[in-house]
């Protein structure tokens, strides 16, 4: 439940500075929000295909076995639903169209983290023509809601092995929600676009990463899966402690800067090394050599 300014400042280590460095426009969309007591609830509607309350009610543990999230007012998404009813995908599509109409835009890259990453998985299926490449970070699709787009688009799924919030392997999160696995997500993409080549490698910065690159796919796209072998539910290397050499979870981004001072939550005061953000950007920019 982070904010746009929390994402820009704390999670990414100052993403605007990278926008200036690489000469791109950075947009930070947010969905609707509300307060549950003193807690700001702010997340994306990641289930954007047609569904029913009964279907959504089947993708979590019983209420006695899970964390029951507060629900948006006047929005019933079923027993296991906790996202808003707003059409966030259409909102983001309209934003992209606006900037394409008013600026000379060559490429559109979509990045989402956590529930934002889950939203990215869904968005690329609904509006693939609107973007060049997308990366979903620590955001698996809810069980039964995995999808592939009807036309080729470059795609990266990034996950963390020790993530219990949105687990890439086990499928059941610590709060009792059911998710697709990273393996099943990437397989549906690779099968759909008939990728013929696969290159696997393991590399290390501070944390260790396993990467699979699928190429010679329909439309000339590339599909990538990256699994961080050391990290929890974190932006790349955001949880790494250089003194101990260990990675752990830190709650970044549930804060605001002065540009969002209307929210009654703590001000942002921490920042990450921007290595992880530049790592993500370079992965997206590598696709430019394909199209």
Per-region residue spans from a language model:
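Second-shell loop/turn segments in exported
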Residues: 78-83, 175-176, 266-267
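Surface-exposed acidic, glycine-flexible loop patches that form ligand/cofactor-binding
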Residues: 15-18, 98-106, 125-126, 143-149, ...
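A structural signal for well-ordered alpha-helical segments within the folded catalytic domains
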Residues: 13, 86-93, 117-121, 129, ...
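The feature captures the conserved acid-bearing segment of alpha/beta-hydrolase catalytic domains
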Residues: 132-219, 227-230
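Serine-hydrolase catalytic machinery in alpha/beta-hydrolase-like enzymes
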Residues: 1-109, 122, 126, 237-248
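Alpha/beta-hydrolase-fold serine-hydrolase catalytic core, especially in secreted/extracellular enzymes
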Residues: 75, 153, 190-291
């Amino acid at each position: 439940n982070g904010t746009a300014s929390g994402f820009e400042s704390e999670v990414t280590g100052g993403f605007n500075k990278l926008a200036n460095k690489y000469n791109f426009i950075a947009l930070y969309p947010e969905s609707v929000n509300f307060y549950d007591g003193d807690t700001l609830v702010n997340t994306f509607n990641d289930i954007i295909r047609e569904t029913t309350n009964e279907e959504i009610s089947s993708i979590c543990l019983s209420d006695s076995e899970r964390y029951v999230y507060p629900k948006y007012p006047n929005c019933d998404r079923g027993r296991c639903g906790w996202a808003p009813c707003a059409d966030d995908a259409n909102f983001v599509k309209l934003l992209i169209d606006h900037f394409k109409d008013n600026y000379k835009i060559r490429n559109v890259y979509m990045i989402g983290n956590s529930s934002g990453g889950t939203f990215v998985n869904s968005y690329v299926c609904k509006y693939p023509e609107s973007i060049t490449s997308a990366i979903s970070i620590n955001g698996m699709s809810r069980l039964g809601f995995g999808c592939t787009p009807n036309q080729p688009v470059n795609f990266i799924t990034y996950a963390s092995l020790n993530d219990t919030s949105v687990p890439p392997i086990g499928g059941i999160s610590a709060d009792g929600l059911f998710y697709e696995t990273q393996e099943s997500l990437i397989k549906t993409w690779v099968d759909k676009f008939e990728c013929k080549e696969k290159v696997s490698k393991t590399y290390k910065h501070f944390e260790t990463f396993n990467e699979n690159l699928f190429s010679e796919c329909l439309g000339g796209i590339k599909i990538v899966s990256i699994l961080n072998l050391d990290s929890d539910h974190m932006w790349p290397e955001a949880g790494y402690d250089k003194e101990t050499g260990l990675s752990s979870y830190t709650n970044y981004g549930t804060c605001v800067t002065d540009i969002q001072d209307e929210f009654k939550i703590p001000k942002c005061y921490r920042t990450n090394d921007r290595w992880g953000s530049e790592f993500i950007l370079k992965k997206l920019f590598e696709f430019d050599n394909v199209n």
